[in-house]
Regions:
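Sec-dependent signal peptide recognition
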Residues: 3-9
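Sec/Tat signal peptide C-region and signal peptidase I cleavage site
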Residues: 17-22
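Extracytoplasmic "Venus flytrap"
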Residues: 24-39
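Short helices/loops that flank or line small-molecule/ion binding pockets
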Residues: 65-76, 93-94
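Structural recognition of the beta-strand scaffold that forms the well-ordered cores
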Residues: 25-27, 55-58, 79-82, 130-132
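Short helix-initiation/N-cap motifs at beta->coil->alpha
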Residues: 58-67, 86
Length: 139
């Protein structure tokens, strides 16, 4: 399920933003070797289907906030960031997240694609600031 959502999100971001580029840069905090291998395989599948190369860049979760802030200041943010909920509001306010593009992706996929709670937690004002890709319930 996550594979399908990530591939769909990458595709939609490409088309929604009307950016003409050959590559997508994807930062991930899933840095364990088995998970990196799976993400690399998904990137190759995406490239085979679209002709667009995805560069999967591992970023340790503890370094993500600092690295994203520095990349934003340098004007060198990746196209897609796999991140936790804690970053949604501050990054939306700082302009690190493209709220309009993310909102358009959710609209294109349809809100019924997502758990209502996940969408509510990803809101910034009246818009969805980040595309939920995982929703866990802890009991």
């Amino acid at each position: 399920m996550i594979k399908k959502i990530i591939i769909t999100v990458c595709t939609l971001i490409f088309f929604v933003t009307n950016v003409s580029f050959a590559d997508i840069t994807f930062w991930t905090t899933e840095v364990q070797p088995a998970r990196m291998a799976k993400q690399e395989a998904m990137a190759k599948d995406f490239e085979a289907k679209t002709g667009i190369k995805v560069e999967v860049i591992p970023v340790e979760e503890k370094d993500l906030g600092t690295r994203a802030t520095a990349a934003a200041a340098a004007g060198d943010l990746p196209d897609v960031i796999y991140h936790t909920l804690q970053y949604v509001l501050p990054w939306a306010e700082a302009g690190i997240l493209d709220v309009d593009a993310n909102n358009a992706v959710v609209k294109e996929l349809g809100k019924k694609t997502f758990a209502p709670g996940a969408l509510n937690m990803a809101k910034s004002g009246s818009k969805i600031a980040a595309v939920p890709v995982l929703s866990l319930i802890h009991i």
